[in-house]
């Protein structure tokens, strides 16, 4: 709908021979007394067009052309806002588009021919997934779903490192537990991985090999077994949460030279050095970020010879550019806040278009269980595990609760609320709206022979003009714009808020508008409005990755 009015305003400007490069922005005023839509284009373009804002607004209005029964009135407000008030007939006629498009309603071709990559979860295989990683997984999965609705060819990638110091500690942790099973008394190091999963991996090795590995000083068999079993566990956990990946990228690839070419990490150092942004001092290799106005330079290679996180991250992004992606989205935890700006600066120096790179930082999660907050730690036996949460509250509640708050905000996950069967529970409230519509349609088929799958809808909805009906219809039409807004902000929470408001509109409509007992013409229109609402709820649930139950 927004595109319809944007095109009409652009046509009015052209008809009035008013040329402007300013974008035509349309917003929905919070207060309906200012209209259904409002634009500030007259204020933005006034100077460029050589006119006062209110005079330009009037000239635009004079050249606007709409089909009959589209706009009830147009007003100029304040310094030059143009406010549009739509007719109920236009709104309800537009709802027919929902019924025509079905599951494709809200989709666009904006991303057709473009490749996007979304990197999310990306936990190293050192232990089961924690709840914090789960939040990033859901945020990333929803962003990938949003991109897919806009026509992008989306690659969902998991980036990991199986060669770092933590993996060595993992191997040693398993070896110590294995030696205990062989009858040895071991003083287990405090800084090693302590969870029960380490004992489980050691037990698996003992079942397979008995005491055969007892004398081995090599960590590799222990590390390899741990990596394989933990990755299997991680993938199973993600599958329970309806999260999938198309590609798993091993950081180790960035360390490998190929056909007389340097490794990706070395190539980054060489390129930054040729641009005079590398120096060696204090035994380390530094990225000279002080030349970019920062207080300190940043280490790329430590004095031990190990790279810092920044170097492979830069090389990894170079690899993404080399793979031809038009859009790159990285879903990071809050621990990356200080790092990623340096990665972007390095990419700029290397000549890459960093406007293609978008970063979504999601804050930490704590869970409240029986009034007690449990902290997460992969290395502790009391780790707050994602699997445990899914088993306790279910996949739908887990997914939705992760995105009920902005990704930028710390999330307190109320486990008791997530299990509550009441309207205070957002997942129950949304799914109940869908189930309620399904129940209504089943009853309509039994009592009046209405079949939502076969009923024609042309020019039927226009008989509806009640306040609750029109508000619901208008809310339905906002779905495509909400997809675009959620994607632009990389904020799935906006979609949750929209769907919650839509459910509220439906419940109000259901209470205020008799359906099955209405006159046949009105009854049919109200049933079709319910069908359209069910469709938009389903489409939204698909983006959020939750189920759409037909009965509750």
Curated annotation (Swiss-Prot):
- What one GO molecular function would you report for this record? arginine-tRNA ligase activity
Q: What class of enzyme is it?
A: ligase
* Matching SMART domains: Arg_tRNA_synt_N, DALR_1
Q: Which gene encodes it?
A: argS
Q: Where is this motif: 'HIGH' region?
A: 123-133
Location within or outside the cell: Cytoplasm
For this entry, list what GO says about its biological process: arginyl-tRNA aminoacylation
State the protein's name: Arginine--tRNA ligase
- Identify the Pfam families for this entry: Arg_tRNA_synt_N (PF03485), DALR_1 (PF05746), tRNA-synt_1d (PF00750)
């Amino acid at each position: 709908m927004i595109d319809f009015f944007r095109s009409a305003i652009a046509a009015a400007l052209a008809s009035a021979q008013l040329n402007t490069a300013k974008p035509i922005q349309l917003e929905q005023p919070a207060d309906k007394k200012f209209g259904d839509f409002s634009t500030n284009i007259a204020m933005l373009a006034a100077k460029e067009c050589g006119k006062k804002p209110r005079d330009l607004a009037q000239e635009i209005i004079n050249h606007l052309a709409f089909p009959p029964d589209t706009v009830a009135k147009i007003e100029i407000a304040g310094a030059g806002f143009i406010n549009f008030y739509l007719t109920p007939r236009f709104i309800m006629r537009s709802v027919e588009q929902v019924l025509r498009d079905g599951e494709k309603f809200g989709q666009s071709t904006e991303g057709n021919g473009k490749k996007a990559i979304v990197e999310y979860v990306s936990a190293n295989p050192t232990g089961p997934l924690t709840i914090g990683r789960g939040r990033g997984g859901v945020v990333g999965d929803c962003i990938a779903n949003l991109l897919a609705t806009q026509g992008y060819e989306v690659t969902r990638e998991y980036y990991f490192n199986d060669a770092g110091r933590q993996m060595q500690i993992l191997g040693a942790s398993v070896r110590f537990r294995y030696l205990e099973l062989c009858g040895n008394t071991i003083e287990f190091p405090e800084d090693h991985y302590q969870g029960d999963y380490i004992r489980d991996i050691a037990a698996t090795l003992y079942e397979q090999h008995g005491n055969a590995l007892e004398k081995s000083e090599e960590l590799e068999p222990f590390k390899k077994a741990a990596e394989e079993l933990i990755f299997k566990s991680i993938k199973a956990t993600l599958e329970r949460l309806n999260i999938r990946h198309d590609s798993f990228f091993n950081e180790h690839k960035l360390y490998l030279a190929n056909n007389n070419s340097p490794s990706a990490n070395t190539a980054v150092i060489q390129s930054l050095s040729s641009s005079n942004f590398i120096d060696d001092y204090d035994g380390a290799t530094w990225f000279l970020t002080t030349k970019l106005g920062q207080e300190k330079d940043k280490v790329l290679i430590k004095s031990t010879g190990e790279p810092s996180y920044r170097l492979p991250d830069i090389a990894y992004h170079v690899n993404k550019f080399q793979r031809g992606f038009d859009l790159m989205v990285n879903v990071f935890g809050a621990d990356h806040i200080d790092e990623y700006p340096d990665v972007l600066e390095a990419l700029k120096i290397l000549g890459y278009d960093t406007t293609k790179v978008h970063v979504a930082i999601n804050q930490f999660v704590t869970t409240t269980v029986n009034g007690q907050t449990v902290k997460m730690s992969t290395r502790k036996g009391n780790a707050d595990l994602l699997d445990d949460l899914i088993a306790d509250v279910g996949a739908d509640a887990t997914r939705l609760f992760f995105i009920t708050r902005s990704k930028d905000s710390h999330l307190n996950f109320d486990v008791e609320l997530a299990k509550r069967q009441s309207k205070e529970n957002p997942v129950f409230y949304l799914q109940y709206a869908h189930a309620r519509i399904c129940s209504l349609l089943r009853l309509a088929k039994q009592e009046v022979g209405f079949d939502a799958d076969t009923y024609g809808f042309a020019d039927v909805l226009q008989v509806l003009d009640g306040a609750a009906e029109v508000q619901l219809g208008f809310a339905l039409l906002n779905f495509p714009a909400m997809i675009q807004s959620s994607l632009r902000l990389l904020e799935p929470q906006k979609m949750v808020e929209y769907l919650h408001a839509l459910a509220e509109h439906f419940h109000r409509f259901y209470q205020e508008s008799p359906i099955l007992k209405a006159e046949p013409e009105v009854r049919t229109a109200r049933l079709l409005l319910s069908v359209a609402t069910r469709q938009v709820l389903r489409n939204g649930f698909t983006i959020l990755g939750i189920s759409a139950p037909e009965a509750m």
